[in-house]
């Protein structure tokens, strides 16, 4: 099919940052393939692409569909955005839940990138990966999500260097607090998680866990709207010399400075104060014998 617009694939385009990005790019002259998991979830101005990044057959079918559409022009952009968020204490996170978040946030992103790289090479296109400031500054009870984002950031850094010789550029977007529908999902998941804590450990974790989640999600609700990230994605796709990493969102530069410059002990103390966490050693008497 002939189309004079540059083509871009956006994964996780049903809601949040992905949906805002798909709409922003469509309004800026891109032909957007919106990766969604259910029919009817794509923004109206985009081409829907059924794409659950954890299902190899859907990834393969999506690549074939895009290839048939773009032809020799290739793919100008890929936005790796699909992801999920959960909050669990490391001691208590179900291993199946941990595996699933890595399947979506890491393995799925690599699978999509591998699938579309031949088309990106054709167009000397760009890959924009949606990460998180949490890849460098993780929160208590945010271990599973932060670990997946740190893994994704590491892979992105290697990928950027590996494909540069092909004319393909790779950019990592690191947002801080962004208000999306995911906030409600994390809160609901946290309420269910407490019910799953073993009774002998619930007394140790429940108060600090629920307090931290409530405070963190309140900060997310006060954060930037998804369109702020979408505009940075657009810039990363079109800038003559894009940065390797963009920081996005309220207080993100302050957080990056804290992560990069303050001693770990002081960072921990700040987080305890902000999130109302117990002091070191304060729960020793409550540890089951």
Tell where the protein language model's regions lie, with residue ranges.
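The beta1-alpha1 cofactor-binding region of Rossmann-like NAD(H)/NADP(H)-dependent oxidoreductases
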Residues: 51-64, 95
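Active-site helix of classical SDR
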Residues: 113, 148-151
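Substrate-binding pocket helix/loop in short-chain dehydrogenase/reductase
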Residues: 89-90, 97-99, 124
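C-terminal beta-strand-loop-alpha-helix "lid" module of Rossmann-like NAD(P)-dependent dehydrogenases
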Residues: 165-219
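Conserved glycine-rich cofactor-binding loop
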Residues: 14-15
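Conserved NAD(P)H cofactor-binding loop of Rossmann-fold oxidoreductase domains
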Residues: 81-86
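Residue(s) in the substrate-gating loop at a strand-loop-helix junction
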Residues: 132
């Amino acid at each position: 099919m002939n189309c004079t617009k540059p083509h871009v694939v956006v994964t996780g385009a049903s809601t949040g940052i992905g949906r805002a990005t798909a709409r922003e790019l469509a309004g800026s002259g891109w032909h957007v393939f919106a990766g969604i998991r259910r029919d009817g979830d794509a923004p109206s101005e985009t081409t829907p692409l059924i794409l659950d990044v954890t299902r190899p057959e859907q990834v393969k079918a999506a690549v074939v569909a895009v290839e048939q559409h773009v032809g020799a022009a290739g793919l100008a952009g890929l936005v790796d955005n699909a992801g999920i968020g959960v909050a669990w204490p490391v001691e208590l996170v179900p291993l199946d839940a941990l595996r699933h978040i890595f399947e979506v946030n890491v393995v799925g992103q690599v699978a999509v990138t591998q699938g579309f790289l031949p088309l990106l090479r054709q167009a000397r296109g760009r890959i924009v990966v949606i990460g998180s400031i949490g890849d460098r500054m993780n929160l208590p009870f945010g271990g599973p999500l932060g670990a997946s984002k740190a893994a994704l950031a590491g892979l992105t850094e290697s990928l950027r260097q590996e494909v540069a010789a092909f004319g393909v550029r790779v950019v990592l977007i690191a947002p801080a607090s962004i208000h999306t529908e995911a906030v409600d999902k994390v809160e609901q998941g946290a309420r269910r998680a407490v019910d799953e804590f073993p009774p002998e450990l619930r007394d140790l974790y429940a108060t600090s866990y629920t307090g931290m989640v409530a405070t963190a999600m309140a900060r997310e609700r006060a954060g930037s709207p998804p369109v702020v990230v979408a505009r940075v994605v657009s810039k990363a796709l079109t800038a003559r010399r894009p940065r390797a990493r963009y920081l996005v969102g309220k207080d993100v530069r302050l957080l990056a400075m804290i992560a990069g410059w303050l001693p770990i002990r002081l960072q921990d103390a700040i987080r305890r104060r902000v999130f109302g966490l117990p002091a070191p050693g304060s729960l020793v008497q409550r540890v089951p014998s």
